[in-house]
């Protein structure tokens, strides 16, 4: 299984060689997770259990980020609950952990983990009680036998989007379906929600789930002209999706994110045909696949290389790069 790792010499060398001159001094993280081991359900991703700490709070996150981005200051961002499949008391505990971290640091905003069966008025009351400013939905909560093919309303019902509009919340959406943002159903619901509820800010996770960049290249044109639509680029390691966002939606609607702790796994995601595959440090024997030495580095570094190449291809200025790393999120985040 992949493990949440500490920095290696290969990680440090790559950052110094390729990224130190690109990453601004101050960053904001639009997609990161906090959790406690006791909040993980029995079927939770084992990588979350492999960390040394029992509770991954902002202090633990900052220690890890100092390894990924040496010399940089993380000024704030959006906190998402980490145990996205949690239920019952574990789910409540997740949301309360996020709320405590938000209350202790003005630079951060937090999301409430929601399930489609939650009454919208319960969602409204909990967001207010906990001092949160966003919602986090996830397809595993859809109730569908095959959650990877769920329609957006199956795990993000319109009644909850209406609450987000009325409370001026942001929503982080990790869409599914085989072709992601190129799927007509996903396009329909994203546009419908954004146009019907303009005071809701919708963030499409992972470059509109552009793990296969051709889905983003082919699908994002259908979502032009939505001022409350954003994309964050966490954990995307193939070139193309970030360029499509900048080209079709504008650099001012692209957000930097890490998807911590995924940022601290070693490997990358690779487009294959009309899909994609994740290759981690334990997926295959890296010592035997090439005539030369191959050593995977942090996913978070691979995604930064992709963002750097997108900025270069789109001829972004330094100030536009700084927008992606922090300023755009400052414009989006609501108090």
Predicted regions and their residues:
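Active-site environment of divalent metal-dependent phosphoester hydrolases
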Residues: 33-38, 84-87, 117-119, 141-144, ...
């Amino acid at each position: 299984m992949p493990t949440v790792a500490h920095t290696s010499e290969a990680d440090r060398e790559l950052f110094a060689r390729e990224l130190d001159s690109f990453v601004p001094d101050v960053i904001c993280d639009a997609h990161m997770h906090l959790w406690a081991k006791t909040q993980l359900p029995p079927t939770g991703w084992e990588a979350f259990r492999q960390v040394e700490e029992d509770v991954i709070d902002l202090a633990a996150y900052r220690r890890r980020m100092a390894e990924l981005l040496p010399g940089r200051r993380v000024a704030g961002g959006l906190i998402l609950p980490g145990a996205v499949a949690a239920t019952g008391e574990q789910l409540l505990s997740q949301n309360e952990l996020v709320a405590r971290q938000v209350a202790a640091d003005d630079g951060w905003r937090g999301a409430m983990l929601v399930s489609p069966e939650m009454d919208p008025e319960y969602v409204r009351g909990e967001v207010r009680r906990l001092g949160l400013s966003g919602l986090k939905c996830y397809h595993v909560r859809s109730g569908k036998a095959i959650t990877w093919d769920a329609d957006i309303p199956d795990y993000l019902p319109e009644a909850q989007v209406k609450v987000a509009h009325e409370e001026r919340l942001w929503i982080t959406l990790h869409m599914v379906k085989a072709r992601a943002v190129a799927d007509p159903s996903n396009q329909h619901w994203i546009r419908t929600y954004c146009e019907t509820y303009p005071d809701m800010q919708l963030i499409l996770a992972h470059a509109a789930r552009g793990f296969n960049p051709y889905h983003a290249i082919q699908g994002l044109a259908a979502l032009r002209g939505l001022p409350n639509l954003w994309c964050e680029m966490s954990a995307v390691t193939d070139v193309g999706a970030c360029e499509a966002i900048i080209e079709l939606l504008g650099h001012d609607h692209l957000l930097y994110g890490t998807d911590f702790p995924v940022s601290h796994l070693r490997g990358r995601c690779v487009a294959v045909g009309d899909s994609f595959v994740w290759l981690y440090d334990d997926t295959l024997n890296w010592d035997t696949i090439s005539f030369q030495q191959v050593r995977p580095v942090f996913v978070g570094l691979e995604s930064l290389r992709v963002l750097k190449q997108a900025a270069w291809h789109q001829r972004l200025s330094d100030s536009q790069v700084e927008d992606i790393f922090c300023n755009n999120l400052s414009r989006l985040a609501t108090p």
